Amino acid sequence: MKKYFAFLLSLILLAGCQAPGGSGNNYQQITPDEAIALMETSSDYVIVDVRTPEEFNEKHIPNAINIPNETIQTSEIPQLPDKEQMILVYCRSGNRSKQASEKLSALGYTNIAEFGGINSWPGETVSE
């Protein structure tokens, strides 16, 4: 567990040092297993499901909040007041979560980790 935590810490530090990508946005991509390890070793994060409310209600990761990708625009997001807090982003298959991560980065959020879609999520899920 200590090695996994050290690996994640290194990953986070490296992501903070990387140059922005071609689109000018900066977020890290991690695996679902890395997201689980982060959730097990930290409490200072928020899980954001960027699917539609209907998809979210069918099945989502426990404690995730639903902010549909289509609603992330150019203004502040009330559910995410701390722009430095770790934001773990996912969708169904990974496409919308990448788009949302780029938009969040453009809004000034600095600690974003995108981990794909719930289709490949090995952990627990709940429904509304």
How should each PLM-predicted stretch be described?
Residues 2-8, 13-38, 54-86, 92-128:
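Rhodanese-like catalytic fold shared by cysteine-dependent sulfurtransferases
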